[in-house]
From Swiss-Prot:
The active site is at D473 (proton acceptor). Residues 28-131, 143-250 form the Gnk2-homologous domain. It is found in: Membrane. It is a single-pass membrane protein. Residues 1-27 form the signal peptide. It comes from Arabidopsis thaliana. It catalyses: L-seryl-[protein] + ATP = O-phospho-L-seryl-[protein] + ADP + H(+); L-threonyl-[protein] + ATP = O-phospho-L-threonyl-[protein] + ADP + H(+). The modification Phosphotyrosine is found at Y421, Y521. This is Cysteine-rich receptor-like protein kinase 40. Residues 28-287 are extracellular. The keyword Transmembrane helix applies. InterPro entries: GNK2, GNK2_sf, Kinase-like_dom_sf, Prot_kinase_dom, Protein_kinase_ATP_BS, Ser/Thr_kinase_AS. It is an enzyme of class 2 (transferase). The modification Phosphoserine is found at S477.
Length: 654
């Protein structure tokens, strides 16, 4: 029975992965000017033209360009199938994609969709302007594999071999050999040191020049590489080209492809012992040489240590600013000298104060080499004790992502516990979003970029990093903004490390900020990635409204937003500075925010779903239900505690 259950789980998981992959590959992108639905002349012309495309592409050697109607409602369509296509497979592929376009892009004039089935890839592209012979490099569609490369793999070696494969495939795909459908296409199969086989496919529409094709494919690779280099495969496409790679064969594209073998291992030293002659008739083998070198090195090391001790006694090392330190897991970081930090901050001068948090004060510092840093000096008795200090040092040392603040090092001399971060010039998000004057600087484009960046940072913590981390204190004051207003998630003192297969944990030690804490965490100490999703939802609603979560007496922002949503008036909560921006896009974010603050944690999305929703104009997003109103219960239970008070307590045993 156990084996049968395990088999059913495996088959269900495999089927789900296949369905996800097919959905990913067949994602239509709608863009450009809008029109008035199916009743418009443009829509009617498109509905007449599209049903003819599948037949036409077959009799035109796999590539067909057509138009129908008169300007300004003229419809242009371009259809293509890949090299070596099966006619039935090509026909079915084009039929499916034209239907997807008609369904998903009812009110947009421009669209493209690269898709496929088991036997072929194909493209359906349409516009109200001629696209033939012109490369189009926006908008991109990028879909990564949901699986990440295991930390046990040699990632550096994998990236090197992956880049080499990209270059080979790109060069071959853009040689423009053959007739229409044979041009600008290359499928390659290669062995990697860390994986048995890697499959890669690149394709452009055959109406382009070789130069345009190379630029287009290069951009596709760039879009994938930028955010998803650690994934086990993925796809990136533009209206004029298509790039996909995976660890398994796809689209029947590799049956007749010769496998490029994995590069040979680096040559080792010859096992045959070589000799060095020292006297006639005598020689020393490598074993003897190694013994001599070891003894010589050991003597030099003793001499060096002696010099260090002598100079240390004379005080010659007092001006050393930092030293490398290794924790119990072998992770290296910098331990800064307290005197150097005191000098950098002008003895923690109030003029250098950047901000005040629940656990300490942050100062700006400048090292003698001109490097600017942010110095967080923990307040004694603040609640962030040794455990939280060591936790933040240990976690941030292992994390590297453009949307996470970078820890440069630490200092723990005497009673002082200090963290040294990269300096982020624009302070934290709360200084902008809740300031009447500065909020106007947060345009719709800037806010969207901040929201998306925070989401990507959380996705990295939850799924993409070598560790699995729950932040537990996500709020606007813990989001720093760099010079270009890109967000960086900060303050990992209360973060919780999960095992790779762990999805949920319980704690008696509750730490965070009331109003941002998920109900199951605040009331029962239950922690999961969905706890961070809840906090993200509250913060997203703050970004849209420009109001603090505690600005609405007795109910909170989520409750207020939900009431307006039910009334059909979600625009009431929109910040007046955003009124002139695309209403549908802003309301979509309100919908996502409400989904993130659902009372039942299983009803909240994952951060990967949030990323997909943010980047798609066509995916149907679920409708939210009433969100959690934990602050109403919490206020009645704990008296006058504010919605924004820091919480650092322990649940009593029951």
């Amino acid at each position: 029975m156990g084996k049968c259950s395990a088999l059913m789980i495996f088959l269900s998981s495999s089927l789900l992965l296949v369905l996800q992959t097919l959905h990913v590959v067949n994602a239509v992108k709608c863009f450009g000017n809008s029109f008035n639905g199916n009743s418009s002349t443009f829509a009617q012309n498109r509905q007449k033209l599209f049903p003819t495309l599948a037949d036409k592409v077959i009799i035109n050697d796999g590539f067909y360009n057509a138009s129908l109607g008169q300007d300004p409602d003229k419809v242009y369509a371009l259809v293509s199938c890949a090299r070596g296509y099966d006619q039935d497979a090509c026909y079915n592929c084009v039929q499916s994609l034209t239907q997807n376009t008609l369904t998903d892009c009812r009110s947009r004039r421009d669209s493209f969709i690269w898709g496929g089935n088991d036997d072929v890839t194909c493209l359906v592209r349409s516009s109200n302007q001629s696209t033939f012979g012109s490369v189009q490099l926006k908008p991109p569609v990028v879909w990564p594999s949901p699986d990440t490369i295991e930390s046990s793999k040699n990632i550096t070696l994998f990236k090197q071999q992956w880049e080499e494969m990209v270059n080979r495939t790109l060069e071959a795909a853009t040689k423009a050999e053959g007739s229409s459908v044979l041009k600008y296409y290359k499928a390659e199969k290669a062995g990697f040191t860390e994986f048995p086989d890697v499959y890669m496919l690149m394709q452009c529409t055959p109406d382009l020049s070789s130069r345009d094709c190379k630029q287009c494919l290069g951009d596709c690779v760039m879009y994938f590489r930028k955010d998803y280099m650690g994934r086990k495969g993925g796809m990136a496409s533009l209206p004029s080209c298509y790039f996909r790679w995976d660890l398994y064969s796809f689209h029947n594209a590799f049956d007749n492809v010769t496998r490029v073998p994995a590069p040979p291992p680096r040559p080792h030293a010859q096992e045959k012992e070589s000799c060095i002659t020292v006297k006639k008739g005598k020689s020393i083998g490598y074993g003897g040489i190694i013994a001599i070198v070891v003894v010589f090195t050991f003597i030099n090391l003793l001499v060096f240590i002696g010099f260090i001790k002598v100079y240390a006694r004379r005080g010659k090392l007092n001006n050393v600013g930092s030293a490398e330190y290794s924790d119990s897991d072998g992770q290296f970081m910098l331990r800064f000298d307290l005197g150097m930090i005191v000098m950098a901050t002008d003895d923690f001068s109030s003029e250098n104060t950047l901000g005040q948090g629940g656990f300490g004060t942050v100062y700006k510092g400048t090292f003698p080499n001109g490097q600017e840093v942010a110095v967080k000096r923990l307040t004694k008795g603040s609640g962030q004790g040794d455990m939280e200090f060591k936790n933040e040092v240990s976690l941030l040392t292992r994390l590297q992502h453009k949307n996470l603040v970078k820890l440069l090092g630490f200092c723990n001399e005497g009673d002082e516990e200090i963290l040294v971060y990269e300096f982020v010039p624009n302070s934290s998000l709360d200084h902008f979003i809740f300031d009447e004057d500065k909020r106007s600087l947060l345009t719709w484009e800037v806010r969207f970029r901040i929201i998306e960046g925070i989401a990507r940072g959380l996705l990295y913590l939850h799924e993409d990093s070598q560790l699995k981390i729950i932040h537990r204190d996500l709020k606007a004051s813990n989001i720093l903004l760099d010079a270009e207003m890109n967000p960086k998630v900060a303050d990992f003192g209360t973060a919780r490390l999960f095992d790779s297969d762990e999805t949920r944990a319980e704690t008696k030690r509750i730490a965070g900020t009331r109003g941002y804490m998920a109900p199951e965490y605040l009331n029962h100490g239950q922690i999961s990635a969905k706890s961070d999703v809840y906090s993200f939802g509250v913060m997203l609603l703050e970004m849209i409204s420009g109001e603090r979560n505690n600005s609405f007496e007795g109910e909170g922002l989520a409750a207020f937003a939900w009431k307006r949503w039910v009334e059909g008036k979600p625009e009431i909560i929109i910040d007046p500075f955003l009124i002139e921006n695309p209403r549908n896009e802003i309301i979509k974010l309100i919908q996502i925010g409400l989904l993130c603050v659902q009372e039942n944690s299983t009803k909240r999305p994952t951060m990967s779903s949030v990323i997909i929703w943010l980047g798609s104009e066509t995916i149907i997003i679920p409708l939210p239900k009433a969100p959690a109103f934990t602050w109403i219960r919490s206020q009645s239970e704990s008296g006058a505690m504010s919605l924004s008070d820091d919480v650092f307590t322990e649940l009593s045993c029951r």
